[in-house]
């Protein structure tokens, strides 16, 4: 029940809040053991890519490189953020306290939008009002170096994820304050759209690194605060708690 409920939640979230998705063709395919939104990360020098899950903090290691063949883009690189179905290697079983599993099959369900935090916020020239940040069914979450933001916007033309930017503003005690900014639009826009973007924390950028280092965790927990311009001069604010070491750990 837990597995199917989570799959339904994630599937609904991806279908509603992504600009584009990629679904498997053909029959229903393998009977997967679980479904996850995952980050595809490079493994150690002795191994290939691994998957780090959002839901339970599991790490999935493929038994062969071919297992992840379906997660490759046309240029041969791996998509960084995807929703997948996972079949555990024979003999593996989800066990309380165990965080690492070997997997024999991985099926691509959807590709999430992902991009880096903007590190040149002073060059952004426009800011249009968003309708909302998150809603009762789709909340902001942060894990494995990504801040995942569902939001609703207005437009008169087709937009893509490069028309939206998340950047760090300041550190306040245990909180990293960020701002989500829509830079393409129109003040009289009337069409409403929804999106989900996974924003990657750029720890290789010195200014961001220094700002993040000023955040003071409480027992390894920090708060990421996302702000945005709302309609009628309203300030939109959403917050999420996450592990500081987990957010750093992918880099």
Predicted regions and their residues:
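Short beta-strand elements
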Residues: 230-251
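Flexible glycine-rich surface loops and low-complexity tracts that mediate binding to linear polymers
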Residues: 70-100, 225
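Short helix-loop boundary/capping segments
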Residues: 131-194
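Short, solvent-exposed, Trp/other aromatic-anchored flexible loops in extracytoplasmic proteins
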Residues: 75-78, 186-224, 229
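Beta-strand/loop nucleic-acid-binding surfaces
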Residues: 54-75
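Surface-exposed beta-loop interaction hotspot
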Residues: 92-154
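Bacterial Sec-dependent N-terminal signal peptides
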Residues: 1-44
């Amino acid at each position: 029940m837990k597995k199917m409920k989570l799959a339904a939640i994630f599937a609904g979230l991806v279908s509603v809040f992504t600009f584009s998705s990629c679904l498997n063709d053909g029959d229903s395919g393998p009977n997967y053991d679980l479904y996850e939104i995952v980050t595809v990360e490079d493994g150690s020098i002795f191994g290939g890519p691994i998957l780090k899950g959002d839901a339970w903090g599991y790490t999935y290691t493929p038994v062969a490189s071919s297992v992840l063949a379906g997660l490759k883009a046309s240029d041969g690189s791996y998509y960084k953020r995807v929703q997948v179905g996972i079949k555990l290697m024979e003999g593996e079983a989800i066990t309380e306290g165990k965080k690492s599993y070997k997997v024999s099959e991985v099926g691509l369900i959807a590709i999430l939008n992902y991009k880096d935090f903007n590190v040149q916020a002073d060059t952004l020239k426009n800011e249009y009002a968003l309708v909302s940040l998150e809603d009762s069914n789709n909340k902001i979450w942060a894990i494995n170096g990504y801040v995942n933001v569902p939001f609703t916007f207005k437009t008169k033309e087709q937009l893509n994820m490069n028309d939206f930017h998340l950047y760090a503003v300041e550190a306040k005690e245990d909180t990293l304050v960020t701002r989500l900014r829509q830079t393409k639009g129109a003040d009289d826009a009337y069409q409403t759209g929804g999106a989900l973007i996974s924003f990657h924390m750029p720890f290789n950028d010195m200014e961001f690194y220094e700002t993040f280092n000023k955040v003071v965790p409480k027992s390894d927990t920090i708060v990421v605060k996302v702000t945005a311009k709302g309609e009628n001069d309203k300030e939109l604010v959403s917050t999420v708690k996450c592990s500081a070491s987990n957010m750093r750990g992918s880099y």
